[in-house]
Amino acid sequence: QTVEYVPASINGPHGCANYGLCTDVTTTLVSSTNISVIYEYGCDPDNCYCLEGTTNGTEPCDTIEDQCGNNPCGDPKYFLCTSKIKSYSCSCKPGFTGNDCKSELGSACATSPCRSGATCESVDNSTAGYKCICKWNQMGENCEYDNFCANPQCQNNGNCSMVVDNANWICSCPPGWQGRRCETPDTVTTPPVWDGCYKYNFQSIGATTTKFSDNQLTVDKCNKYALQQSSDTVTMNYLTLCGGFCMVSEGPLCNDTSNWDDDCKKKCGGNNNEFCGVLNKRCIVYEAGTAEVDENACDNSTFCSADLGQGLCINWQSDFTDGYACICKPLWTGRNCENPVPEACTPSPCLNGTCVLNDQYNKFTCVCDDGFFGDKCQYSDICTSATCLYGGTCTELNNGDYKCDCLLQYFGKNCEVINRCDYGKPCNNGKCASTIDGITTNYTCTCDDGWTGTNCDTMIDFCIPNPCSYNSTCKPKFKGYDCTCITGLTGVNCSTIIDLCVPYKDSTGKWIKTPCNSKDDMANCTKGINTLTCSCGDKWTDTLCDLNILIKDVLMAIYGYVDLTMISLLNDLMQNPSQIKDMVPFITGLLTDSERSDLSWDAGDLFNWIAFEDQRLDLNRDIHKWNDVVLGNCFTFNHRDRNFTYRLRSSGRHGGIQAFMKTRQDEYAPWYDTAAINVFIHNRDDYVFSESVRYNAQPNAQSTMNIFMTRYTRLGGRYGKCVKKPSEVKNYYYPGAYTTDGCLRTCYQDRMKQECNCMDPRYPQAPGNVTSCQLSERSCVTVASEAAGDPSKWWDCVCPLPCSNQEYSVTWSKANFVNLPIICGKSSDVSTCKAHYIDQLMVSIVLPQLDFKIYAENPAMDFNKFLSQLGGQLGVLMGINLVTFIEVVFLLFGLFTLCCKKYGK
Amino acid sequence: MRGGGFVQIFKDFSNWSTVAVVPHVANANNKISRIFWIAIFLFVLGMFAYELYILIAKFFSYPATVNTEILFEKQIFPVVTVCNMNPYKYSVVKSNSAFSSVNTLMTTYSDATVGTFSTDKWGLYADNDETYDLDSRAADALVLEANLISDTAKVPALYTYADLIQDCSFAGIPCSESDFTKFIDPVYGACYSFNEDASLNYSVSREGIQFGLKLMLTVTQTKTNGNTDSLPTTKLAGARIGVNSRGSSPGLDSNGIDAGVGYESAVSVSLTQNVRAKKPYGTCVDREPDSSDYYKDFIYTLETCFNGCKQRDTIAKCQCANPRLALGSTDTACQPIKADLDCLQTLKGNQTSSTPNIDLLVECNCNPPCDESTYTPTVSLAQFPSTSYYVATSSTAGVGSCSSTNSKFSSKSDCQKWYNNNGMIIQVFLETLSYELYTETAGYTVSNVINDLGGQAGLWLGLSVISVVEMTGLMLVMGAFCVTGGAIKMAPDDDEIENDHRIKDVEDVKKEIDHLEKKHGEMESGSDGEVDDIENKGDEEKKKK
């Protein structure tokens, strides 16, 4: 049973156009019989690999790239260019012929009489006449001769000319020169001969002889000078060299040789190998060289058969080739051109063609008949259309063989071999070994390191499994991998944890043991991946043990969380803890009244009971609760907002207030250093500020406060300036009656509003949308307050005294509770009861006497008193009364009348 | 003729009267001028009348002026009264049969404070919800119970001088029990007053703490054996101090100073004297009427007046007297029963009620005293004893010094601790020898009235004493004229004037002047001049006569 493969397409070898190759040849069973099995092979269009010079068009590889874009054939007017795969073919356009296709059909140049390279031009449009325009190195009527004189050949102004039937060239030398290119002088010189060293005598040598001087004197230069000075009658035969002087003479100039050995060996300035002697002492004497004209050997006409016309004689140097050389005609040879040479075409060497003779060189060229090739047309034609396969070009060789110029990717004598590894790059990263398996070629890939897969197109992934520790990112690369460590890890495989618990130098240059120990020396640091764990001491907390526990407690109490922006501020606060009480209002001032009130005490928190005139009061009805930013919740008896007004009806303790209260120190904020109940005693219309006069009532004691009232009334109008209502001043932000303190604080708040764009939260705010200063703005408030100074001295702050106000002065005394109260004596736990009891206190407000002082401004003199005193003074001193003024008026009137009369006259 | 005579008299008077405008009215040339001057006269007379009214009204309003003087002189040292805040020794109350009722009260109150109530005669069970009401009722009940016990029977439970005062010195000189006057206060028990007796003459010639009274007191809230000796109703450990002038009521219940144990209480006092004016310039009184004066033994003060008024109100409403206040000779003290205690409770402040009880300021008609001395105290504290002080005392009746020989304490520190819990030092001194004297005097006296009246009269009418004499003279002349029937001549008759040679001479001159004026054509002006001259000369002649 035979297996036969049949191509599915006329395109070879795999079905792609223009000899395209297939990267994956498919075979299909067409028929199968007992005798044979026939497969049809083809190529999927997507797998066609186009040869260089072809591209995909309508079908794969069906378009041949244009190779005639730059007119490779020549002038487009005469040539017709056809593109081929990576080449082109040239032909003459219709109507033209000749080698350069410039000759029109029917003209004299149509037969191409001129040599290749020359230009043929018709003469007068005749069919017979033509003119050949030769190239620069051509000559002859049809430019059939090479012009050897086109390139410069002659030297020393020699003249080149073609001779011996234009088969050779010759230089006509000017006088004094000889040789084929006139390169050889026509004289023969002998060198100077050293004669001896003699003593120098200026009187006999230097004074009269012919001489010249040269610092670079050599013997040759002196010899040339002697030749120049020689004439037909006088011959300079001796050279005398004394230092840099050359003296020439017919006879020797000196012959004194005494003591010459020590002074003669002075080297010449121009040639260290020669001796010139020393001036004034010794001179070297040479015998001058001679110059003879070389004989012209061509004078003998028998040389080179010149007389016979078989060659030409060239004069040459006498010691070389006997003084002449021969240039023979093409048909002659030999030393003297005496031997004849037959013509190249006689007999004809062309076996199957016509012999063409080249006269210039006596060479032949065979023009073979059809069907024959070779130098002598001895070989029959071998190239046919089937000789070279797959687009290869067949060229017949001179030895009778042929050569196929295959397209790319095709190999073999007949271009029948396809190397699969040469196209398509089947092995991307490896070595390809081609194998032949039927009509389809196959390959085996030996992959390089780092690659895998059938075609070695898959890079080995070294990241499977992941070699990087702690789930770091592995990035594969050629022959390896790169681990991109997560923060806190290092090493090739990220297997090393960077230890953050290392000493470092802080901004002040101080070494810190670990980051955990910047504040807390007792902290322990444990390293982790991109982190560290600090075990803090008992005074510090937070991640790095740099947050004071007190600060954290404060922040948790204020904000409910640790506000990082406030930590630095609070750290500064720890250096000066007394500031914290001043800073708290800047935080609580941001809250609403209801929120602040909820943070502070209720009446039930502070009061066990309160009594007035020995009668217990109702906390909800008689005690008014209000909130201040600094003081918190305050409780006022007889507040102005209450409907009922209690009056003081009797003096003494039984006519005053008594209260039994609690300080609740267990619920104090940690920044309060003292425990007491602040007692403010004021007129009911006055507003209480956090800076108003207060009295402290101490725990575990009864504090008795005796109050004394003083009332002030002032005169307004022209007697002075006083204020009756808050509306009389520019701004007044506080409820109740006008007070100087309130007015000054109003000025202060206006200044804070102007400077810091917010108001101090420690005082009540102005109505409207004015915001309270926050903790971050506290420094602005502090600086502005210090810069502004006392509000009472500001030019825009006018705060007169009120027209009427009351002041209370207080004296106090104190007595402690008994050591064992009866309620604790009965208690089961005495110590706990006592600890609870000493946190309480009693306050007693007493008016010892009912009388009080009134300081009232009265006018020192009223109108009536003024009249009385005026009348008294006038009456006593001058007896003047009111009628006196009228009498004076009458007197003046009379005088006026009298003067008028006199003037009238 | 009579009418003519009066007119003549008035004319003569008006010519020489010093009252303003009157001569002008009499000598007016025409009717318009006369009306003008009459109008002026009426105007100034009206103004004078108005000003006179103002002066009289001001005088009868009796304004007062307070003069302030700052005096610097030697002063009599004030009376200093000290009492223990615990009125009775609890150990004696528990053991003495005379105090059995008080002991029962204390026991019932102690149980009530821890929530155990029982039916008792004082009604403590009624205040089981309120601590204050319970404490208040118990304190009142204690006063009432103690009032039933005679002073003699109280002596064992009271603190003696030796119990209370361990050391006493005045200006560095030791003082003794004889310098103190003892009295029994209904609230504080035994109290001792220094310099109260008139026979004592303690005075201060230099100010400062070195020249005052220094007392070391022990209140013994805890005995040396560790037992508590304070009554259950006593809440404070210390002494009650009163500073007042001699003869005044101490008023400890109302106005005393609290001095606590464990401290030295330095009490500096400054004196203020008030001298007030009586009616009509002021309202001060020297004493109340005898019928309503409950504090006859003391100098009158507003406080004594108010206390008496309150006592009368209590008697009127409760039919019994409050022992805290002074009792009259015919008054009966309230009994320590629930009914009386409830009645006393209703008399306390209830201003919010629709029927409030007595307002002393409005209903008592109390007036300030005409002479009053007030001491204003200022208290400062120091720790007592210091840790290294061994508490030296010369008294042998008390606990004694903290020396090694004291057998009452096991160690010196125990002794110091006892003194810290039970002892104190009181220093009372004059802050300065200068004191303020406020004297209320009449602000507008008769002298002021006369001054102002003279000025106003002089300005408007030109009136003076001379004018008054003139008026008097006019009245006498008119009277004489009426009596004699017009026989007296005040001026010569017209005929006599014509015969007088001086008048003739004047007439001759007049003729000549008229003649000259005719020549110059200035007849009218010349006549006017002559008339004036004649009138002037006539006046001179009249005056000469």
From Swiss-Prot, chain B:
Tell me, what controls this protein's activity?
Inhibited by the diuretic drug amiloride.
- In this entry, the parts of the chain located on the Cytoplasmic side of the membrane are 1-34, 479-545
**Keyword Iron belongs to the record:** no
Please list the residue ranges that the record places on the Extracellular side of the membrane. Answer: 56-457
InterPro entries, from UniProt? ENaC (IPR001873), ENaC_CS (IPR020903)
* Chemical reaction(s) catalysed: Na(+)(in) = Na(+)(out)
Going by the UniProt record, its keywords in alphabetical order are: Cell membrane, Disulfide bond, Glycoprotein, Ion channel, Ion transport, Membrane, Sodium, Sodium channel, Sodium transport, Transmembrane, Transmembrane helix, Transport
Chief subcellular location equals membrane
Molecular function GO labels: ligand-gated sodium channel activity; pH-gated sodium channel activity
Where is the motif GAS motif annotated in this sequence? 462-464
Cite the residue spans of the region called Disordered. 514-545
Where does the UniProt annotation locate this protein? Cell membrane
- Please list every transmembrane segment annotated in the UniProt record, as residue ranges: 35-55, 458-478
User: In which residue ranges is the amino acid composition biased (Basic and acidic residues)?
Assistant: 514-523, 534-545
Q: Enumerate the glycosylated residues.
A: N201, N350
Q: Name one GO biological process term.
A: sodium ion transmembrane transport
Cysteine disulfide links: C83-C191, C284-C370, C305-C366, C309-C364, C318-C343, C320-C334
Task: Give the family, as the similarity comment puts it.
Answer: Belongs to the amiloride-sensitive sodium channel (TC 1.A.6) family.
Question: What name does UniProt use for this protein?
Answer: Degenerin-like protein asic-2
- Source organism per entry reads Caenorhabditis elegans
